[in-house]
């Protein structure tokens, strides 16, 4: 396993409170390592080969600090729709081309400039607490979807001549 640090991982907290205890992460483009926050580590050589994504079922209720080594990934989809996800932090993901993040709480700022400089497509929706988003230096952006972020008051979009689609609504 690579050493998982704040600089090279995606970090967030999973809050298992009800009967639904399963977390699904869809990824593609390279190897990944997941620390599920309960002492279990999982290495995935080819996450795209796993139909429905990488799935983990928590046995007990509680809060778990999840870390995902994502330096090689080109796509990741993390959603808190079915299980509560909060406090998201992004590490260095230089190969990331498609980033999908939905239904996440307790995250006030996302700065993709440093961590996802080569991202081409972003889908950021239903962040209950997101106030500020920065993507002005993500020069390869082609598809931008930002929606249903009720506290979003500041976005640094910059100039993106290659953008083919921009959807920004209910923010």
Question: What is each PLM-predicted segment?
Answer:
Residues 1-105, 117, 139:
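N-terminal capping/linker segments that flank leucine-rich repeat
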Residues 72, 78-84, 95, 100-107, ...:
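Concave beta-strand-loop units of leucine-rich repeat
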Residues 88, 133, 155:
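Acidic/charged coordination and interface sites in well-structured regions
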């Amino acid at each position: 396993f690579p050493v998982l640090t704040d600089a090279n991982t995606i970090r967030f907290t999973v809050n298992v409170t009800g009967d639904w205890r399963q977390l699904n992460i869809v990824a593609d483009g390279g190897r990944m390592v997941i620390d599920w926050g309960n002492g279990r580590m999982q290495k995935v050589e080819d996450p795209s080969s796993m139909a429905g994504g990488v799935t983990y079922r928590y046995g007990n209720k509680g809060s778990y600090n999840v870390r995902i080594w994502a330096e090689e990934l080109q796509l990741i989809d993390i959603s808190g729709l079915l299980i509560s996800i909060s406090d998201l932090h992004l590490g260095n993901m230089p190969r990331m081309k498609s980033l999908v993040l939905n239904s996440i709480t307790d995250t006030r700022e996302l700065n993709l400039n440093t961590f996802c400089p080569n991202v081409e497509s972003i889908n950021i929706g239903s962040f209950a607490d997101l106030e500020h988003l920065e993507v002005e230096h993500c020069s390869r952006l082609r598809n931008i979807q930002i929606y249903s972020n009720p506290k979003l008051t500041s976005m640094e979009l910059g100039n993106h001549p290659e953008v083919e689609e921009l959807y920004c609504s209910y923010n």
